[in-house]
Curated annotation (Swiss-Prot):
Signal sequence annotation: 1-22
One of the record's GO molecular function terms: serine-type endopeptidase activity
Record-given protein name: Serine protease 27
Gene Ontology cellular component annotations, sorted alphabetically: extracellular region; plasma membrane
Record CDD domains: Tryp_SPc
Peptidase S1 domain residues: 35-277
Organ and tissue specificity: Expressed predominantly in the pancreas.
Protein family membership: Belongs to the peptidase S1 family.
Top-level lineage group: Eukaryota
EC number(s) stated in the UniProt entry for this protein: 3.4.21.-
Keywords: Disulfide bond, Glycoprotein, Hydrolase, Protease, Secreted, Serine protease, Signal, Zymogen
Main location: secreted
Amino acid sequence: MRRPAAVPLLLLLCFGSQRAKAATACGRPRMLNRMVGGQDTQEGEWPWQVSIQRNGSHFCGGSLIAEQWVLTAAHCFRNTSETSLYQVLLGARQLVQPGPHAMYARVRQVESNPLYQGTASSADVALVELEAPVPFTNYILPVCLPDPSVIFETGMNCWVTGWGSPSEEDLLPEPRILQKLAVPIIDTPKCNLLYSKDTEFGYQPKTIKNDMLCAGFEEGKKDACKGDSGGPLVCLVGQSWLQAGVISWGEGCARQNRPGVYIRVTAHHNWIHRIIPKLQFQPARLGGQK
C-alpha cells in the first residue's frame, strides 16, 4: 500500500533537483535573454560582470565563473600576496551607490598564470578565489566557460562589458554605469596585419600570439579601454553566453588598425581546470561552433 506513494515522491525529488540545477545554470541571465562608443547596460543584463577593487577603488573587471571564483587578467595584479587590499563587487550596474542587488566579497587568494611575463604577453589570465561562496541571485550568476572544442568563428558578433574609460582622455562619468559594446571577432592573420600597419606614425609592430583573440573594428572608434582590463568578451552560443576572451591589451583605445586583444579562454582550459577541478566547461555539442 505504501509503495505507490514513493513514486510521486521520487518524481518530486528529481524535479526539485532539476529545478535547482537549472537555477544555477551558467551563462543565462534571468532578467533579460562605458566603453569607447559603448552604451549603458540594464540591471541584471550581465550578472557575471564584477568590479575588482583595490582600497575601495575600481581598477579591473572580471567575470564570475563559479560561486567562489572570478576570472580576470594577470596584469591587474602586481602583487598577488596583498589580498587584504582587494575586494570584489558583484551584482552591480553602477559603481557609485551600487544598490540593493550588489554585494562585496573579500579575496582569499589570487592565482596568476605562471607563464605570464608582462605587458602584451601570452597567458595574461588570473583566477581570484573569494573568501566565501557567493549566493546566486537574479543579479549574480556565473558565465559559461567554453570547452576547447568550441571555436568562435571570424565575424561572430560578441559583447564586451566594463566600467572603463569612454575614451583615452576621459573617465566614465558618475554614477559610472556598466557599459556594453558589440564587437566582431577578427581572425588572427588579419589582426597581425593590422598591428603591423602605421609604423610611420611611431607604432611598433605587435604579434598576436596563439592564445590571443582579436575583436573590434578596423576603423577604430569603438573599443574597451582603461579600467576594462580583465573583463569578459562573451558570445551567445545557442541559448547560453560563453566567455571567449579576457580583456588583455591594445594600442591606446579605439585607434584605427588597433582592435582589442583578448586572451583566448579555451587556450587556458587545462590551467583553469587544474585550479578549479570541479568547474564544468560548455562543449561544442551543446551549441558551440566547429
